[in-house]
């Protein structure tokens, strides 16, 4: 206990030098933690948007459907499967979809798209696309009008259409014949992924089924939303065994990039912080070497009157750790305030919106960091302080008391 008190007082003997070191540590941690929170917020947003808009957590397909979107390769007995899936533990909601490639045409332009036929009520339980349509941009199949279509803002701009405009969709039906129909635009959505937006249009299941001449109780896709997306792989494997005639894929297989984000973001953040702490560690070592040089005579006197080398080593280690922890405390406090503030108001990157949306990220990002990260950083700083104290302490132990006392 006495060594701890002495070490704490020694830290503040040179207030300016200690303050500079503490400020350097705090600045490094603020930069590292805020950058980590920013990256983490962007990654989590991308993951949430993917589940909510694009993939759900698990998808069923006919094994041959994914090869070329052949409309004949369907999932049979869809209604029965949906009812059974809802009873499966861990499943929150399910819906079925029709999918077919098509050509969307207006008077000005043609574009290739994927038509998605949906059951509006079930679709809204699994996906959040309806939330991406603001009040001025129409609705998501709230009316019972026939041949309605919801398209993206990006596609509407390309095709030069607006609400109540008509789009002609041409595609191959169940019998292999080229067919098509005109659909009226009732809603225009905008997600954070402009590339995905341009490729997908949404119509009612019954409208598309009629034109496709697809038999009832058959679908191209079943989407499953879980209570916990971390259980997707386990539940998907169980469902694959239960339904061997279909392919059950969890989100990590459907979107490998999202799987990479969730798996390696923690590792990337850890490496990032290690680099910062490594640089700060060298700064601490340099400072403590200066301290040893300035206190050569004092250390020599302490050893001359009987302080053991072990106690000298521990005292210097405590001084180094105190410097590191005080810097960490200030750094984490400032980081917490910044992250909480920008986590509410967001960081506006509107100047780069087009580029960010092309890869599926929002123009306004919200930093977020789990509380456990602060505990982990504190431990890492503590360990850094101990490691940084070793070399200066060894230098102090090599001092000869008789020569050290005579040092001016």
Where are these regions (language model features)?
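Short helix-loop junctions at transmembrane helix boundaries
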Residues: 314, 329-376, 390
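Hydrophobic alpha-helical transmembrane segments of multi-pass inner-membrane transport and secretion
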Residues: 15-42, 263-298, 321-330, 379-387
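Transmembrane alpha-helical interface segments in multi-pass membrane proteins
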Residues: 289, 297-343, 376, 384
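A structural signal for hydrophobic secondary-structure junctions
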Residues: 63, 73-202, 206-216
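Mechanotransmission and gating elements of multispan inner-membrane complexes involved in transport
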Residues: 172-269
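Alpha-helical transmembrane segments
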Residues: 30-58, 339-346
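A short amphipathic helical element positioned immediately N-terminal to and/or at the very start
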Residues: 3-12
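C-terminal membrane-exit region of the final transmembrane helix in multipass inner-membrane proteins
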Residues: 367-408
